């Protein structure tokens, strides 16, 4: 009964321990899956044809495919996509997603072959995941700038005297200022004006207009950018008075400066180009010196571009760009038949000041990205952890069951009834009553007899457990006469009387058993502990004189 109860208890304990182990394993798997998926964000469901045309390559086709397994196969990729439940695609750019149309998630309803609780695309659609830790190492933006164009619109006034025509030389200076910034697209028109003048004075006014807009944006998944735009307009007028005689001038001016902006990490590099325009004029032999004008403009405009991340981590770049533009106009006029040349030189220099905060943020993001990449676990590592936990739990359960069984076995009480031979005067020995008297009544070990003593080793003088002290020898009836038989019976009676003074022979065993649980036969111990010898209570032949004399003698 106790063993049946113990078996039931063991089965119940095994079921409870197995249930707890299953819960722990489930929690461990969920935490590991969450750790692996922490670096990727779900972007949406897109058409498989569009994703494949964007350059994503097939990484593997796995019968036990899952979202985490696909992401572990492409740890350094910017985007991963799952198709038809078992195919995994990887890509290194996310810019193509802005030009694609997102589909509904119902089109990506195919379950993953290795983990049916997640969706892995559809028959013609893909689930797309974007790596949130991907650092946008370079932002390419093209910016072009066309220089200011000057339109000369001369107007003439004929109100001069002959004295002024003879020889008059005047010099004027024109100051021209232009403001320019980094621009994505700036369109400028160049206007050419030509006039023929036969007067002694001319007034020239020039207007320079420059409109720039600055837009800087950096896009990652779920990122909003703020755009800073500025417009600068500058108008400069100049007046030139000169005394000429029959002068024909033709002016063509076009200056273009192109800037290319490339942003890599937190540094911006601008390249500038310098163009020179030559303005040729033809004058008559009586031409005089034309004034020389020069102008310069300096612009210092800080531009701040900030990005506010919503769900993913981006690196804000704060950069101050100082653009300095210098326009120098030189006019050289010679006499006689030589040509007049006007040279416009535009020089632009850029001074960059990058914020240290941007550099520190970029370095911190790079370190975090590297540490996160090192902390990723591969699919084999996850499988090994799960298998190790399962076998560890099973091993612990087996050890507990073995200890419980051993403890129960050690506490089981030994039943002496099962070890007995059910023989009278016996504690389980094969020889219930070995014949052999103690060596002497004075020794202390008279109860410790050797159980190897048998009747064959006892001589005629030590028969029936006692010695013939009277010197009578027992012999077989065939070799004795009637007188010798009577003598032997008399000696036997004397030996019986002497035996009454001897202690009873009790064959004890070592105290190796629990004395409280010992059980003995009902007929063994009481009879053996009596001081007198055994007697015949109901003799078969009460008329036998020998037995009657023996009984009466013992009673006396």
Swiss-Prot record:
<feature type="compositionally biased region" description="Low complexity">
    <location>
        <begin position="184"/>
        <end position="257"/>
    </location>
</feature>
<keyword id="KW-0325">Glycoprotein</keyword>
<feature type="topological domain" description="Cytoplasmic">
    <location>
        <begin position="406"/>
        <end position="556"/>
    </location>
</feature>
<feature type="signal peptide">
    <location>
        <begin position="1"/>
        <end position="38"/>
    </location>
</feature>
<dbReference type="GO" id="GO:0009408">
    <property type="term" value="P:response to heat"/>
</dbReference>
<dbReference type="GO" id="GO:0005886">
    <property type="term" value="C:plasma membrane"/>
</dbReference>
<feature type="transmembrane region" description="Helical">
    <location>
        <begin position="385"/>
        <end position="405"/>
    </location>
</feature>
<feature type="compositionally biased region" description="Polar residues">
    <location>
        <begin position="546"/>
        <end position="556"/>
    </location>
</feature>
<dbReference type="GO" id="GO:0000425">
    <property type="term" value="P:pexophagy"/>
</dbReference>
<dbReference type="InterPro" id="IPR051694">
    <property type="entry name" value="Immunoregulatory_rcpt-like"/>
</dbReference>
<dbReference type="GO" id="GO:0043332">
    <property type="term" value="C:mating projection tip"/>
</dbReference>
<keyword id="KW-0472">Membrane</keyword>
<feature type="region of interest" description="Disordered">
    <location>
        <begin position="534"/>
        <end position="556"/>
    </location>
</feature>
<feature type="glycosylation site" description="N-linked (GlcNAc...) asparagine">
    <location>
        <position position="84"/>
    </location>
</feature>
<dbReference type="GO" id="GO:0007266">
    <property type="term" value="P:Rho protein signal transduction"/>
</dbReference>
<feature type="region of interest" description="Disordered">
    <location>
        <begin position="269"/>
        <end position="312"/>
    </location>
</feature>
<keyword id="KW-0961">Cell wall biogenesis/degradation</keyword>
<dbReference type="InterPro" id="IPR002889">
    <property type="entry name" value="WSC_carb-bd"/>
</dbReference>
<protein>
    <recommendedName>
        <fullName>Cell wall integrity and stress response component 3</fullName>
    </recommendedName>
</protein>
<feature type="glycosylation site" description="N-linked (GlcNAc...) asparagine">
    <location>
        <position position="370"/>
    </location>
</feature>
<keyword id="KW-1133">Transmembrane helix</keyword>
<keyword id="KW-0812">Transmembrane</keyword>
<feature type="topological domain" description="Extracellular">
    <location>
        <begin position="39"/>
        <end position="384"/>
    </location>
</feature>
<dbReference type="GO" id="GO:0000324">
    <property type="term" value="C:fungal-type vacuole"/>
</dbReference>
<feature type="region of interest" description="Disordered">
    <location>
        <begin position="425"/>
        <end position="444"/>
    </location>
</feature>
<feature type="domain" description="WSC">
    <location>
        <begin position="39"/>
        <end position="132"/>
    </location>
</feature>
<feature type="glycosylation site" description="N-linked (GlcNAc...) asparagine">
    <location>
        <position position="367"/>
    </location>
</feature>
<feature type="compositionally biased region" description="Low complexity">
    <location>
        <begin position="142"/>
        <end position="169"/>
    </location>
</feature>
<feature type="region of interest" description="Disordered">
    <location>
        <begin position="142"/>
        <end position="257"/>
    </location>
</feature>
<dbReference type="GO" id="GO:0071555">
    <property type="term" value="P:cell wall organization"/>
</dbReference>
<dbReference type="GO" id="GO:0004888">
    <property type="term" value="F:transmembrane signaling receptor activity"/>
</dbReference>
<keyword id="KW-0732">Signal</keyword>
<dbReference type="Pfam" id="PF01822">
    <property type="entry name" value="WSC"/>
</dbReference>
